[in-house]
C-alpha cells in the first residue's frame, strides 16, 4: 500500500457579481464547469469544481456573487449560499475587477474580515485597464484594506497568472485523504450540468433582454439504446412576452440555443445527445421560495 502523503482542501471563490469568478474557476480546472456569461448573477448554485494533480486535490466552491440588494427571494437565497460557503474552507480567493471598487466589493470584504481563512486577492481583468498608471495606486489601496495572504493581478480570460494562484492554493492544502476520485471534475450530477449548459446559452443568445427570471428544469435524462442520452429541458419564464423572446421568430432562437447546448453537452458527457426544449410560463417563481426549493435552488444552503 502506498504511504505517499496526499493533500486536500476546500477553496472558496468569492466576489461581487460579474468580476470573473466562474471564468477563473474554469481556467483553474482546465475546463468549463461553471457557467460564464456577461450578465451579473449567472452562477446560482455553489458548483464545486475539483482539480486533482498528483498528491494535491483542490475542491473549489464557486459562490454566487454576494450583492447588496436582497429584495427577491432568489437574491436572498443566493447571498445566503455565498456567505455559507466562506465558512469552512482552507483558503478564500477574493476576485475584484481591475481598478473598480464598489459598495458590493466592500460588503464582500467586510464578510471576509470576519473569517478565519487566509485570503488571496485576485485582481482580474488587469489587461482591460485603460489607464495603466492607475493600477499601482489601486493595488496599494487594496493592500491597505486587509491583510491579504497575497495580491495577484490576473486575467482569468487569457489565463495570465492563473498558475500563480494554483501554486498558492497547492501550498495551502492540508495533508488529508482525497475526497473524490482523481477523474472527478465536479460533484454535481450530469442532469444539473445539462441545466447549467442550457441556462448559459439562454444568457448568451438573449443578452440583456432576458431578465434573471428564467430557469431550466431537466424533466427527462435517460440513456438511450445508442449509448447516448435523451434529454428534455423545460425553460421556465415569468411572462408570455419572455416566452416569445426565448422561442424567437419562427422558433429560430430556441433552435440555436438547443443546437449550441447539445454541442456542449456532447463534449462534456462524451456521448451523443438528443435534446428537446420547451418553454413554459410560471409567473413569479423568483419571488416564491417554495418554488425555488422545488427547482433545486436551496439544496445546499
UniProtKB/Swiss-Prot annotation:
Supply the SUPFAM superfamilies for this chain.
P-loop containing nucleoside triphosphate hydrolases (SSF52540), Prokaryotic type KH domain (KH-domain type II) (SSF54814)
The KH type-2 domain is annotated at 206-283
Region G2, residue ranges: 41-45
Record region (G1): 15-22
**GO MF term set:** GTP binding; GTPase activity; ribosomal small subunit binding; small ribosomal subunit rRNA binding
Tell me, what's a Pfam family for it?
MMR_HSR1
Spans annotated as G3: 62-65
Keywords, A to Z, come to: Cell inner membrane, Cell membrane, Cytoplasm, GTP-binding, Membrane, Nucleotide-binding, Ribosome biogenesis, RNA-binding, rRNA-binding
Indicate whether Nucleotidyltransferase appears among the record's keywords.
no
| Residue ranges constituting the Era-type G domain according to the UniProt record | 7-175
Subunit (UniProt) = Monomer.
Which HAMAP family does the record cross-reference, listed alphabetically?
GTPase_Era
Q: What is this protein called?
A: GTPase Era
Q: Which organism is it from?
A: Salmonella schwarzengrund (strain CVM19633)
Query: What taxonomic classification does the UniProt entry list for its organism?
Result: Bacteria, Pseudomonadati, Pseudomonadota, Gammaproteobacteria, Enterobacterales
Gene this chain is encoded by:
era
